[in-house]
């Protein structure tokens, strides 16, 4: 299990270092020191996303930040983030965030950016349950009260 988490962490580090390049499963499997099939399987198991979806969401989130903060053209951002074409980038952006990149750059609406959860190398320790106490909760209904608020004293 520790070996799997370490491999997923190495893949996440590789992705973050090479996010503006084209990343394939062969490069990720080399970083993980596993076969491409097994690297994809453990990545999906620990992150809940396939490597392709993880990379696409990370690229789109970084491009959304660049559109919001910098005055770059959509074409430049699409090329720098490694999308094959501007049309493909615009379709992926709309599918991910629900708006066009041009509309977003002109008036940024709040969007859910993808923030990856990094796999930590620490292992959870099992807690000793011998020193625990049970807590009983009881709902008590009280009558409504009137409140008088005095302002401007």
Where do the model's predicted regions map?
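Basic, helix-initiating cap at the start of DNA-binding domains
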Residues: 1-6, 53
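Terminal helix-turn-helix DNA-binding modules in bacterial transcription factors
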Residues: 9-26, 44-81, 107-126
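Helix-turn-helix
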Residues: 27-40
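The short coil/loop that forms the "turn" connecting the two helices of the helix-turn-helix
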Residues: 34, 83-84
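Short hydrophobic/aromatic patch on the recognition helix
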Residues: 37-39, 43, 88-89, 93
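A solvent-exposed interaction/effector surface
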Residues: 61, 65-68, 73, 84-153
């Amino acid at each position: 299990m520790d070996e799997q988490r370490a491999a997923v962490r190495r893949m996440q580090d590789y992705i973050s270092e090479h996010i503006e390049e084209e990343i394939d499963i062969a490069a990720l499997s080399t970083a993980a020191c596993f076969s491409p099939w097994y690297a994809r399987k453990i990545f999906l198991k620990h992150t809940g996303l396939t490597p392709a979806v993880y990379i696409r969401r990370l690229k789109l989130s970084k491009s959304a930040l660049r559109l919001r903060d910098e005055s770059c053209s959509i074409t430049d951002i699409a090329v720098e983030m490694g999308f094959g074409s501007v049309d493909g980038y615009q379709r992926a952006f709309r599918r991910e965030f629900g708006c066009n990149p041009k509309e977003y750059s002109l008036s940024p609406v709040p969007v859910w950016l993808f923030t990856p959860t990094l796999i930590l190398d620490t292992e959870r320790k099992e807690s000793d349950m011998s020193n625990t106490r049970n807590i009983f909760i009881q709902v008590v209904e009280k009558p409504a009260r009137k409140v008088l608020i005095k302002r401007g004293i």
